[in-house]
């Protein structure tokens, strides 16, 4: 069934209470929206993205912006290159240089997609896999509001920060060719408290690619080791901590 009309018009509201994920991972393996639109404004409702204690929460992924790109599949469900149904895996054709697509991931109470009730969840993770140099060059992901990130100690990615908890992770190693699970070509982002995540995928070059994004915090970074970084936070007096 389709939840298209019911979703229109809801707004993001930051609730004070944060529900800690407490080590629970997210999974995008149960989409409820049939044939979601691949144009700006298209969205998919995902059922039971995370369960904390005895309570499950849903998510809505929405396409906010598209530049120099065509989305061939909102979320590919296959096992190519270590993909799985639990990943959010948009398949994209970059039609011109410097293309990008921005998504929002909004967390809501279970079953409330008809009249979304936002929830604020803490201590959650997104991991972008296989950002190597095979396929469109200079592939990247960007996000905002993250409280920390993890890269491999000899990563193939560069990090450019444009603000506190705002930045881009991009393949910076020409010729790098890794498996889908290689720790050198991935990044994990942590969000300490949020009800909406902004996530951008993109590339400098052109051509097709399927992005692999999981709601996990993997511990195995073979053939490298994890290098974690924490983003300073601003307290009420304007200093950083």
Regions found by a protein language model. Name each.
Residues 1-18:
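Bacterial Sec-dependent N-terminal signal peptides
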Residues 18-44, 48-49, 133-232:
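Contiguous ligand/interfacial binding patches
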Residues 18-99, 231-240:
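N-terminal targeting leaders for non-cytosolic proteins
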Residues 89-101, 173-182:
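Extracellular beta-rich ligand/substrate-recognition surface
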Residues 95-99, 118-120, 191-193:
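Solvent-exposed loop and beta-edge segments used for protein-protein assembly and interaction
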Residues 99-112:
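A Trp-anchored, charged/polar loop motif used as the substrate-binding/catalytic surface
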Residues 104-106, 123-129, 198-200:
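Residues within well-ordered beta-strands of beta-sheet-rich folds
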Residues 112-125:
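Extended extracellular/luminal ectodomain segments enriched in beta-structured repeat modules
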């Amino acid at each position: 069934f389709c939840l298209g009309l019911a979703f229109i018009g809801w707004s993001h509201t930051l609730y004070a209470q944060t529900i800690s994920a407490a080590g629970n991972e997210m999974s995008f393996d149960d989409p409820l929206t049939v044939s979601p639109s691949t144009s700006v404004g298209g969205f998919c409702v995902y059922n039971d993205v995370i369960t904390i204690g005895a309570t499950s929460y849903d998510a809505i992924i929405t396409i906010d912006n598209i530049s120099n790109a065509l989305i061939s599949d909102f979320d590919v469900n296959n096992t190519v290159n270590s993909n799985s149904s639990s990943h959010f895996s948009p398949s994209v054709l970059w039609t011109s240089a410097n293309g990008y697509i921005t998504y929002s991931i909004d967390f809501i109470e279970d079953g409330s997609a008809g009249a979304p009730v936002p929830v604020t969840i803490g201590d959650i993770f997104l991991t972008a896999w296989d950002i190597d140099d095979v396929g469109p060059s200079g592939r990247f992901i960007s996000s905002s509001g993250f409280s920390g990130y993890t890269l491999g100690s000899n990563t193939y990615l560069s990090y450019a920060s444009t603000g506190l908890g705002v930045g881009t992770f991009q393949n910076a190693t020409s010729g790098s060719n890794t498996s889908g699970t290689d720790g050198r070509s991935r990044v994990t982002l942590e969000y300490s408290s949020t009800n909406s995540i902004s996530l951008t995928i993109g590339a400098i070059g052109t051509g097709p690619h399927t992005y692999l994004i999981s709601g996990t915090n993997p511990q195995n970074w073979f053939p490298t080791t994890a290098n974690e970084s924490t983003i300073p936070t601003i307290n009420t007096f304007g200093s950083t901590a």
